[in-house]
Amino acid sequence: MMRDDRAVNEVVGFILVFSLVLTTVSLVYAAGFTGLDNTRDVERVNNAERAFDVLANNFQQMGRGEAPNRATEIKLADAQLTTTAERNVTVNASGTNATGADSTAIRYDTTGDTNIVYEHGAVIRNDSDSAIMRREPDFIFEDGNVVVRFIESRGSGQGIGGSASTVLVRAERDTSKVLVNNGSSPSNISIRMQTHEDRAQVWEDYYEEQIAAANSSWSGDCDDRNSSVGGSDTTRIKCDPFGADKLAVSRVKIQVTLT
């Protein structure tokens, strides 16, 4: 009888130990794969961000006349790449005609809350409600000089995702034009820019910092927003006027095709 009880106890003990081991292995397995998935997703976004930096550099080379065309490969996995509707940006000054560009943004959207955008020469990453400018546009604001090189990317309404693993962003330089070249201390320089509401604060911060670097006596801001201009999800920011010793504005049109 004692042997039977001992045998039963051993079986029960084995079952309990086996169940504990199985539960532990299952938890470690699930946690491990969740961690691997998170690591994979983070690395995918980081790779996309690096690809956008390459794209911005390629566009900058075309903007400076260093290349007639460029192609940039971006890996998608479960993400989607689109070109947005065109949004307007202008630079005005006393005694000059209004100058600007109507440019489409290139946007990478993950399955989560992160997106990366190339817009007017800048690369902006947005995580949920937090946006940061990873790469600044090819503008110069310093020591009284303001040089704005508009990269006017064209080709709105395109989108690739789903089963596509990679996208090739083909860009070809179209036309270039010097819009303003004023070295006679232009005054009342004003910047107006349409952007997605999620990126408005980033652009406000950028322009405020840059204008202050060009004109140390400027005490204005760029927080004058108008959400009734430019359509859905678009807001227009406006900077208070400022002066400079020199203002130069150019525009290069670049045709964008996603394949």
Region locations from a protein language model:
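Hydrophobic alpha-helical segments
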Residues: 1-71
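Short N-terminal edge-element motif at the start of the domain
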Residues: 43-107
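Intrinsically disordered, low-complexity regions enriched in Pro/Ser/Thr/Gly and acidic residues
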Residues: 96-246, 257-259
